[in-house]
């Protein structure tokens, strides 16, 4: 196939809906862990890394919350407690409210 076509659905990349379909099938869990020296880390897990670009999502979340973070396996870890705003920010990104569990 040409480089302008999606290898999964066969549509042009501009019309590709694979990532939206993948977002609808995710079950996302958001929790806060306490690390060394009392530091809090918000952990967002339940993503399928083969269907969603976690590095792009991590960059988006870090800029929205103005914090540092990383991708470890199929989870995104953000420095600080962002539990209260995480659901609305993920909904802005295209995930539905039913998929996100605190």
From Swiss-Prot:
Entry keywords, A to Z: Protein biosynthesis, Translation regulation
InterPro entries reported in the protein's UniProt record: DENR/SUI1_TIF, SUI1, SUI1_arc, SUI1_arc_bac, SUI1_dom_sf
GO MF terms, alphabetically ordered: mRNA binding; translation initiation factor activity
SUPFAM superfamilies assigned to the protein according to its UniProt record, in alphabetical order: eIF1-like (SSF55159)
Domain of life: Archaea
Gene Ontology biological process: formation of translation preinitiation complex; regulation of translation; translation reinitiation
Family annotation (CDD domains): YciH_like
Pfam family of the protein (one): SUI1
NCBIfam families in UniProt: PRK00939.1, SUI1_rel
Family affiliation: Belongs to the SUI1 family.
Matches recorded under HAMAP family: SUI1
Listed name of the protein: Protein translation factor SUI1 homolog
Provenance organism: Methanosarcina mazei (strain ATCC BAA-159 / DSM 3647 / Goe1 / Go1 / JCM 11833 / OCM 88) (Methanosarcina frisia)
